[in-house]
Swiss-Prot record:
Subcellular location(s) per record: Cytoplasm
SUPFAM superfamilies reported for this sequence: S-adenosyl-L-methionine-dependent methyltransferases
Function: Specifically dimethylates two adjacent adenosines (A1518 and A1519) in the loop of a conserved hairpin near the 3'-end of 16S rRNA in the 30S particle. May play a critical role in biogenesis of 30S subunits.
Name of the protein this chain belongs to: Ribosomal RNA small subunit methyltransferase A
Family affiliation: Belongs to the class I-like SAM-binding methyltransferase superfamily. rRNA adenine N(6)-methyltransferase family. RsmA subfamily.
Entry keywords, A to Z: Cytoplasm, Methyltransferase, RNA-binding, rRNA processing, S-adenosyl-L-methionine, Transferase
Encoding gene per record: rsmA
NCBIfam families assigned to the protein according to its UniProt record, in alphabetical order: ksgA (TIGR00755)
Source organism of this protein record: Deinococcus geothermalis (strain DSM 11300 / CIP 105573 / AG-3a)
The UniProt record lists the keyword NAD: no
């Protein structure tokens, strides 16, 4: 600490965050989506909503300075923190000293999420630039039962969107296929240092592991169907390599208009189409 910053200040206070960055010669890296939380109420709300509790295995992606990490560990969770930025090694060695936290250094997009123990909960302030790919990996990892994450408000809206709504797309469909989405709260720009360009939201996704996992072939079909969500479903499927006549017959059999837009089609109807087109048996 500098002489001007009393040690009684919480780690998430702007003064402590600036002090850490200054002493370690660091500047937040925009390319890594580094915006550090400086609001204790929001930190506690994320940990609470995520279910951090004694003995619960928790994965945090992008611990940054260790602010949320400490809150999770303080609640007794067994925390694994996955960090890519090697510059933060001395920072986390300082801020997580004495904490029950395992820090894994590496790229979150290359981590083996299937290796996580059953009952794992993801609780994280996700790097915004890889939010979609990370959420898809969480959904498909059998050991992860929930993900409570801080994301761009626009992404939160897409996750909860239903067919027919303006922001419905493949990410919305994925979330519905694997479980449910709950909006926890919005987070203003001023809760971060540095402040991001957009408003954020905390959402919780619960994954129903008792439900059979979607077939890989069906996931690819849904992705192709929603690739250009405002175009007609017929055009999207033709672009994906399905014959126009076969698509027309499948749409008719499913009771769908030939000009129906992809974003308006429920997953149940897409499954019917997938069967009609030989994607599923």
């Amino acid at each position: 600490m500098t002489q001007s910053e009393p040690p009684s200040l919480p780690l998430y206070s702007p003064a402590r965050v600036r002090d850490l960055l200054t002493r370690h010669g660091l500047r937040p890296t925009k390319s890594l989506g580094q915006n550090f939380l400086i609001d204790g109420n929001i930190l506690r709300a994320i940990a609470q909503a995520g279910g951090a509790a004694p003995g619960v295995p928790v994965l945090e992606v992008g611990p940054g300075l260790g602010v949320l990490t400490r809150e999770l560990a303080a609640r007794g969770a067994h925390v694994t923190a996955l960090e890519k930025d090697e510059r933060l090694r001395p920072v986390l060695a300082e801020t997580l000293a004495g904490q029950d936290v395992q820090v894994v250094w590496g790229d979150a997009l290359e981590f083996d999420y299937a290796s996580l123990p059953a009952g794992t909960r993801v609780i994280a302030n996700l790097p915004y630039y890889i939010t979609g790919p990370l959420l898809a990996r969480f959904m498909q990892a059998p050991g992860i039962i929930s993900a409570t994450v801080l994301v761009q408000k626009e992404v939160a809206g897409r996750l909860a969107a239903r067919p027919g709504e303006d922001n419905y797309g493949f990410l919305s469909a994925l979330a519905a296929l694997y479980g449910t989405v709950q909006h926890v709260r919005d987070v203003p720009k001023g809760a971060f240092l540095p402040a991001p360009d957009v408003t954020s939201s905390v959402v919780r996704l619960d994954f129903d592991r008792a439900r059979p996992a979607p077939e890989p072939a069906f996931l690819k079909f849904v992705e192709a169907a929603l690739h250009h969500r405002r175009k007609t479903l017929r055009n999207n499927l033709r672009l994906a390599g399905f014959g126009g006549e076969a698509v027309g017959e499948a749409l008719m059999a499913a009771g769908l208009r030939p000009d129906v837009r992809a974003e308006d089609v429920p997953l149940e109807d897409l499954r019917v189409l997938a069967r009609r087109l030989g994607v599923l048996r």
